[in-house]
Every structure is written in C-alpha cells, then in structure tokens.
C-alpha cells in the first residue's frame, strides 16, 4: 500500500511537471487556407507510390522520386531549415536540430508507400478526389495523412518564427512499410545505430481512435495508444499422397481430404485468451467479459488469432492432385511465442503426411510504459484536441504490425496512434475501396501534430514555458495495471 501511495504521488508530480513544461503563449497559425491544405493533400495522393508484393508487378520508383520533389516544392521552409537525408534511395529523414544536444531526440515516424487498388471497386478516384467535403484516395488514412500533417504542422511552426527546438526532432518517412520496411525504416534505424542515436520516444502510426458507439452502447471516444504489437507467424501446410490420380478410381484418402481435416482441426481449436491480458491492454478494462466475447474486434485483442487465408490444389476436375497446400496466418499475442504457436499447431494436426513451411514470423513486441513523460504529453495533447468530447485515453495493443519493429533497440518508448476518430467503415476502407478522410479531420490532424510538437518541448526562441493548459483533465490512475506493479 505504501509503495502504491508513493507511485500515485509520483504520477501526480509527473503530470504537474508536464503541464508546466511547455509554452502556453505559443499561438501558431497555419499559413495555408483550408482549401489550400485540402488540395495539397489531394495532390499528394496522386503519386502512385505503390508497394507491390508480387513479382508480376514492378514497383514504379519514379513515382516515389516525384513525391520527393512534391514535398520539396510544397514545404520550402522545411527544406531550408531542416537537414534532409535520403536513405537507401527512397526513404526520407529530416533532422530538426535542437539546441540542447544532451537531450535524446523525438522521432515522428510514418510511411508514404501505399497498397495497390482495384480501381473498378472505387466510386471515386483512388488517386485523389475531393467530394462532399471528403478527400478520397489511397493513403488518405494509411499513411500519407501523417506524412503530410507533420510536414504542414512543422512548416507552420517555422513560418511563425519558432525555428529551433530545444530537443532534436527527426521525421522518418519510410518507402516500403507495406512490404515490411526492410529497405526503408530498417535502414533508417541502421543509420541511427551507426550514428549512436538513442531516442527519447518514437511516435508512429496506429489504430484510429474509436468513435462513439463503435462498441454498441459505449458512448465515449476511445483513444487507444498502442504500447505493444502482436507478433505474427505465416506458414504453408502441404499434404502429399502417392496414389493413382484419375477421378474414376479415387483413393481412400486424398491430399485435399488430408489437408482439409488438418485445417478443420486448426480452425475448430482456437487459442485460449491470455489470463489477465486486460492488465497489459487497458482498453479491455472498459468492457465486461460478455461484451468482449461478442465483439470480434475486442475478442481478437485477448488471444492469438488464426486465419486460413489461401488454399491451392488440383488443375482439372477429373484429375486428383497428389499435393494440396494451404496458407495460415496467426497474430501472436504478448504472452505467447512463435515456438508455442508452431508446436501447438503441429500437435493439433498430428499427421506426418503434412509438412509445415514457415514463410514469415515476428515475436510480439516489447511493451512500452504509459507512465513516461512522452506518453503523458501525448495523452494531454489528445485531451487538448478532443476536449469537447468524452474521451478515454488508454494504453492498448496494436493487432497489426508497423515499422516500429526495426526500432526496438533505439528506444524503450514506442507509441502507436492515429489521431483521427474512425467508425467501422473507415477501418474497412484502409486497405479496401473508397479510403477517405474528411477535410475537417485532416485539418484537425495537422493541428494535433502542431500541438504535440509544441507540447513536447519549448523552443529556444520562446520565452515562457507553460503551453499545456493546467486545467486539462488527466485520466485517473488505473490500479488494475501491470505498469503499477
């Protein structure tokens, strides 16, 4: 009890210090009109910076270089003041050098490559169209919105004569996140290691904030900040038989039948929920057990998931194939491991006629603390931006994967978020059709990053140090958390 009392006291002091750490007199105005900002963002979507993951489609890197030139033309002050480094031909690193070299830098990470589109499935131009106060286009949420919002916010800060931060800030824009970031953010992270850079914190993409009634009956906005990610395991299962292949004389057991039985075992035996997972993922503390079980989004947060994603066998109706293959995908929760998942699946199948070939894997990420200064500043900024609504800011788990996997040794403090309130259809559109953001939400995203940057530190030509409103409400300390132990 005494330890818990002092821990809570420490958090109160931390919040007070944060509230007094940045400049309340700073009033940075955007230098472009609402229309200019919207059309500039629409133009950014016109560059087909597509990451193809199949060899039949060649990536058009000219589009990536055109996007570089677009940024140079749209953000002249940034390119004059910040140091730009091109990493591995196509990724971009901007260094905004701070005046205090003893402070660890802040990294604002994102990516500008996008997934392919099936144009026939789009009602609007997938490469940028403004209609009904919405900006449509691939990348409008994932993830050019963050690239453009951070650039617009910093261009505005610089234009308002706040030219040098106390703490160095890096903008890190990868070019192949949709392929795993091996040539983009992995190389940027290597650049930091070679230059002995350790970061105070990294802010990267995450899940959009959940709109009111995203979970039926829950009326608050849920601002989930990803403090850890699931891992993954992708593999191919193959069954083989040595039998006559004419359909007129079928074998007792076919390759398809053997594989189908194995897949049925896998699908009908899901992984069990991790005990006390809500202590790591505090978003789950907002709901009771029945609500979690009945909601696919919440239920997936409690366990390692299984998805049967592809199957292949046979070439003609009257020929029985001697081999059949299927691909399976698991998203591995913190508390399970790759080896555990692999062993459990092989035990379930229990058939030597089936082989497993691993095609991709990643262990679950480390967990970042929500009680660091960086997290608390992010939390206060969310309250500033969405202060007119009922907002719950909670540390949570990201079920997808980001480029942060390449930075685990650069900092312990990695926070994933998307400062846009989304509904179910917004989630569906991210890698689907008619991906969009409203003009208002885009402008708000620019303001969010402007506030976050100003809140994170004073500037060397700023006289006061009180930017965050002291009256901002801070979420109550949550005792049911692993972080309080």
From Swiss-Prot:
<dbReference type="InterPro" id="IPR001261">
    <property type="entry name" value="ArgE/DapE_CS"/>
</dbReference>
<feature type="active site" description="Proton acceptor">
    <location>
        <position position="177"/>
    </location>
</feature>
<keyword id="KW-0645">Protease</keyword>
<feature type="signal peptide">
    <location>
        <begin position="1"/>
        <end position="21"/>
    </location>
</feature>
<feature type="binding site">
    <location>
        <position position="142"/>
    </location>
    <ligand>
        <name>Zn(2+) 1</name>
    </ligand>
</feature>
<keyword id="KW-0862">Zinc</keyword>
<dbReference type="GO" id="GO:0005576">
    <property type="term" value="C:extracellular region"/>
</dbReference>
<dbReference type="InterPro" id="IPR036264">
    <property type="entry name" value="Bact_exopeptidase_dim_dom"/>
</dbReference>
<feature type="binding site">
    <location>
        <position position="142"/>
    </location>
    <ligand>
        <name>Zn(2+) 2</name>
    </ligand>
</feature>
<dbReference type="InterPro" id="IPR047177">
    <property type="entry name" value="Pept_M20A"/>
</dbReference>
<dbReference type="GO" id="GO:0046872">
    <property type="term" value="F:metal ion binding"/>
</dbReference>
<dbReference type="InterPro" id="IPR002933">
    <property type="entry name" value="Peptidase_M20"/>
</dbReference>
<dbReference type="Pfam" id="PF01546">
    <property type="entry name" value="Peptidase_M20"/>
</dbReference>
<keyword id="KW-0732">Signal</keyword>
<dbReference type="Pfam" id="PF07687">
    <property type="entry name" value="M20_dimer"/>
</dbReference>
<dbReference type="GO" id="GO:0006508">
    <property type="term" value="P:proteolysis"/>
</dbReference>
<dbReference type="InterPro" id="IPR011650">
    <property type="entry name" value="Peptidase_M20_dimer"/>
</dbReference>
<keyword id="KW-0479">Metal-binding</keyword>
<protein>
    <recommendedName>
        <fullName>Probable carboxypeptidase S-like 1</fullName>
        <ecNumber>3.4.17.-</ecNumber>
    </recommendedName>
</protein>
<feature type="binding site">
    <location>
        <position position="204"/>
    </location>
    <ligand>
        <name>Zn(2+) 2</name>
    </ligand>
</feature>
<comment type="similarity">
    <text>Belongs to the peptidase M20A family.</text>
</comment>
<feature type="active site">
    <location>
        <position position="113"/>
    </location>
</feature>
<dbReference type="GO" id="GO:0008233">
    <property type="term" value="F:peptidase activity"/>
</dbReference>
<keyword id="KW-0964">Secreted</keyword>
<feature type="binding site">
    <location>
        <position position="111"/>
    </location>
    <ligand>
        <name>Zn(2+) 2</name>
    </ligand>
</feature>
<keyword id="KW-0378">Hydrolase</keyword>
<feature type="binding site">
    <location>
        <position position="431"/>
    </location>
    <ligand>
        <name>Zn(2+) 1</name>
    </ligand>
</feature>
<feature type="binding site">
    <location>
        <position position="178"/>
    </location>
    <ligand>
        <name>Zn(2+) 1</name>
    </ligand>
</feature>
């Amino acid at each position: 009890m005494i330890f818990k009392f002092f821990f809570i006291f420490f958090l109160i002091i931390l919040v007070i210090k944060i509230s007094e750490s940045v400049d309340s007199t700073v009033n940075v105005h955007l230098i472009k009109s609402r229309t200019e900002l919207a059309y500039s963002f629409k133009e950014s979507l016109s560059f087909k910076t597509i990451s193809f993951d199949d060899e039949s489609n060649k990536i058009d890197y000219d589009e990536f270089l055109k996007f570089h030139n677009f940024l140079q033309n749209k953000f002249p002050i940034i390119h004059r003041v910040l140091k730009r480094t091109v990493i591995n031909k196509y990724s971009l690193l901007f260094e905004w050098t701070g005046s205090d070299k003893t402070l660890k830098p802040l990294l604002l990470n994102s990516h500008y490559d996008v997934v392919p589109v099936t144009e026939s499935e789009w009602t609007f131009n997938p490469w940028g169209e403004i209609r009904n106060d919405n900006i449509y286009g691939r990348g409008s949420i994932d993830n050019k919105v963050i690239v453009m919002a951070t650039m617009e916010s910093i261009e505005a800060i610089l234009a308002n004569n706040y030219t040098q931060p106390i703490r160095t800030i890096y903008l890190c824009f990868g070019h192949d996140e949709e392929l795993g970031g091996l040539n983009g953010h992995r190389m940027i992270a290597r650049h930091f290691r070679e230059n002995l850079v350790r970061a105070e914190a990294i802010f990267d993409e995450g899940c959009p904030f959940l709109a009111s009634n995203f979970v039926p009956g829950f009326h608050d906005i849920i601002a989930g900040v990803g403090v850890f990610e699931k891992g993954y395991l992708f593999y191919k299962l193959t069954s083989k038989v040595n039998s006559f292949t004419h359909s007129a004389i079928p074998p007792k057991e076919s390759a398809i039948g053997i594989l189908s039985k194995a897949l049925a075992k896998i699908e009908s035996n899901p992984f069990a929920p991790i005990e006390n997972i809500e202590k790591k993922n505090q978003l789950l503390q907002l709901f009771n057990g029945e609500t979690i079980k009945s909601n696919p989004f919440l239920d997936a947060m409690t366990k390692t998931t299984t998805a049967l994603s592809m199957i292949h066998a046979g070439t003609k109706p009257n020929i029985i194939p001697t081999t059949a293959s299927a691909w399976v995908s698991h998203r591995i929760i913190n508390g399970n491991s790759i080896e555990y998942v692999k062993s459990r699946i092989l035990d379930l199948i229990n058939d030597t006629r089936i082989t497993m070939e691993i095609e991709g894997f990643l262990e679950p990420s480390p967990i970042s603390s929500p009680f660091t200064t960086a997290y608390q500043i992010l939390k206060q900024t969310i309250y500033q931006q969405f202060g007119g609504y009922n907002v719950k800011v909670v540390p949570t788990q990201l079920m997808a994967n980001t480029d942060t996997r390449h930075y685990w040794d650069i900092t312990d403090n990695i926070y994933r978020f998307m400062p846009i309130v989304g509904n179910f259809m917004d989630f569906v559109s991210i890698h689907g059709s008619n991906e969009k953001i409203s003009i208002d939400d885009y402008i708000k995203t620019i303001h969010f990053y402007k506030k976050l940057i100003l809140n994170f530190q004073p500037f060397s030509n700023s006289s006061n140090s009180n930017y965050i409103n002291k009256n901002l409400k801070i979420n109550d300390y949550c005792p049911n958390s692993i972080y309080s132990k």
